[in-house]
Amino acid sequence: MSGRDGSGVKMAYWAGAHLETTPVPGMNMKGLSVPGKMSVLPQAVWVDENCKRYCNEFWPTAEQRGYQNIFQTRKTKFAICDDNFTEYRQYTLPQHAGFDATESNVQALRDSLDEAYAKFQGTWEEPEQQEQGPMGGPMTAAEFIADDTLEGLADQLGFEGAAKEAFLAQIEEYNQYCEDGADQQFGRDAQVLFPVKQAPFYAVKFEPLLGEPLVTMGGILTDGEQNAVDKNYEPIPGLYVSGNDCGRRFGIEYV
């Protein structure tokens, strides 16, 4: 046995232990993935395929932010920011999957934005040898899309007609919240309401992903002394379960 084939869970189950029933909380159910994880871009504005915000982007932790995404359709989402993003990006809490605002990391982010703008202008020249610079925390090197105007950015994102109007209206509405110091949609704290006004403007596309399971989901239920319990939640004498074979490892997800 390899130790990673579920043997421990199966043996306990065959001995009468109770297997965690669905729905089973997952791990890292961020809902959005490559080229980056939207949950670690809380300073931006997130909109869905209908060009509408759908949550407070600035929840305390990356996991809580990412959790909002699993309730959305499995369609492309977008993070929108302006040219001041390198400043805004530094406003974050020390945490797992956070941004370490060192000088080199901030510069790496600036380089990513400048590269996107150069590609937009048609002046970008691919370097002879691509150096692997500092990532600056998760997904700093995400591929940005740049434009001089929000209208042009909407075009690049594929929004037309009513969708484009909805996109522009949503950003305008959000910017008003920034001016007023109160997010009337989702209650984002005034201290982290960063406007999208300074050109050039940038966006990142995010595609849906169900998650990244690293450990057992839906294992054997135990009591506080690691006794496996039966279907009536009574401890089974002499049968103990711990580690990756345990169920109920997470509440709603990896938080």
Where are these regions (language model features)?
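Alpha-helix capping and helix-loop boundary segments enriched in small/acidic/polar residues
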Residues: 1-3, 34, 38-41, 233, ...
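A conserved FAD-binding loop/helix module that cradles the flavin
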Residues: 1-10, 246-255
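Flavin-binding catalytic cores
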Residues: 7-20, 165, 169
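An anion/pyrophosphate-binding glycine-rich loop and adjacent beta-alpha core
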Residues: 9, 18-159
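Residue-level detector of alpha-helical segments with a strong bias toward transmembrane helices
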Residues: 26, 61, 236, 253-254
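A glycine-rich dinucleotide-binding beta-alpha-beta segment and adjacent secondary-structure elements
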Residues: 149, 156-249, 253
